[in-house]
Amino acid sequence: MTDTDRQAIYLKYYQEPAYRTSETFLKFDLTDGVTEVTARLRVERSATADADAPLRLEGDDLELISVVVNGTLLSGNQFQRDERSLTLFELPETADITVVTRIYPEQNTALEGLYRSGSMYCTQCEAEGFRRITYYQDRPDVLSRFTTTLVADGDRYPVMLANGNLLTDETLADGRRSVTWHDPFPKPSYLFALV
């Protein structure tokens, strides 16, 4: 998104989100050239939202691999996708949504979302950069607890950090390293960080 694409957002047009994402589980499979991001979201419909309210997830420059709602893989006619969003319809009051995307951090010259700087992967999510990582309610009034797993070559990437407290740090059967962080404090997506 360029500066000319950005539009002013006015308080007088504010609408409460139809859904809240209470828990966010992210897995980053970091390899040279491409990163696969699996985002599992626990969402609840807001008490003031209509029963048929859609869930709109923002996303920029993402390659969508799959969408699963409560264990059911959705086909292309069960959601709507455009350049900047993924919209899900007819959701129950609560849902577990899993979205798998591919991103290309080495090609990310916008320096928003996940990008590569020298030999490190970094994130810049403020103000709307998280939508360049995965489809998400990338707005400051949706607060979620984040659990983040990073999987990469531990020799090449000895520093693997994300928000919160370290839960696990292990070597996988293929020799790669898997590190999981959990942040117990709800926060908006623009405060997400990974290095």
Where do the protein language model's features map onto the residues?
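Acidic/His-enriched low-complexity segments
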Residues: 1-195
